[in-house]
């Protein structure tokens, strides 16, 4: 069985992205394989592709940091989900000691493809009344805002937070977090 994936072998614009075929791999013991139904497009991916992200991939590299789909294989240590579950995946949550998305996780866990293998701890069950498209696009803005507001700034209940511009998805997510 073949899997179409998107990868790139050098930094640049969208023209560096290429669709290649590879064999479908089996997940390792703590991973799941997802039949990708939808994926999110993110500014972080553009920055990664253009060479402006805090981490740089090892080439050739896969790409894609959020997706939704249906689990079709699970590793031997995975008990939190089962084959057939509809899930969201956010595999870019594999961090290094500086809390940056690691080059290894970028190369290994990109979700642009027919299937994607991701660590089981980076998936969440899809909300039943959400479409796959909605589920794939609902994560990064909130995680970006949470990282800045909660993880890095330690904002707590009753703290004051001012948004000088709230038109981006991350700012809208941030406003919902601090309510």
Please state what every model-predicted region is:
Residues 44-50:
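Cytochrome P450 core scaffold surrounding the K-helix E-X-X-R motif
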Residues 106-120:
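A structural motif shared across PLP-dependent enzymes of the aminotransferase-like
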Residues 94-104:
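Short, Lys/Arg- and Gly-enriched loop/turn segments at beta-strand edges
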Residues 135-179:
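Mid-domain Rossmann-like dinucleotide-binding core that forms the NAD(H)/NADP(H) cofactor-binding site
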Residues 117-125, 129:
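Structured surface patches comprising rigid loops and adjacent beta-strands/short helices at the edges
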Residues 5, 69-71, 84, 161, ...:
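Hydrophobic alpha-helical segments that mediate membrane insertion or helix-helix packing
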Residues 23-40, 52-96, 109-110, 130:
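Glycine-rich beta-strand-centered segment in the early N-terminal region that forms part
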């Amino acid at each position: 069985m073949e899997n179409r994936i998107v990868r790139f072998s050098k930094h640049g614009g969208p023209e560096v992205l290429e669709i290649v075929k590879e064999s479908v791999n089996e997940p390792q013991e703590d991973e799941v394989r997802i039949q990708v139904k939808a994926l999110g497009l993110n500014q972080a991916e553009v920055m990664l592709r253009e060479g402006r992200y805090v981490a740089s991939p090892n080439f050739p590299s896969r790409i894609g940091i959020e997706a939704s789909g249906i689990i079709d294989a699970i590793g031997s240590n995975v008990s939190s989900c089962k084959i057939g579950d509809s899930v969201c995946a956010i595999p870019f949550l594999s961090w290094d000691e500086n809390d940056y998305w690691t080059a290894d996780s970028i190369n290994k866990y990109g979700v642009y493809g027919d299937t994607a293998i991701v660590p089981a701890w980076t998936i969440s069950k899809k909300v039943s009344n959400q479409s796959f498209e909605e589920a794939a696009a609902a994560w990064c803005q909130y995680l970006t805002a949470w990282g800045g507001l909660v993880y890095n700034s330690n904002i707590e209940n009753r703290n004051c937070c001012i948004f000088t511009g709230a038109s981006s998805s991350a700012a809208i997510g941030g406003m919902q977090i601090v309510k």
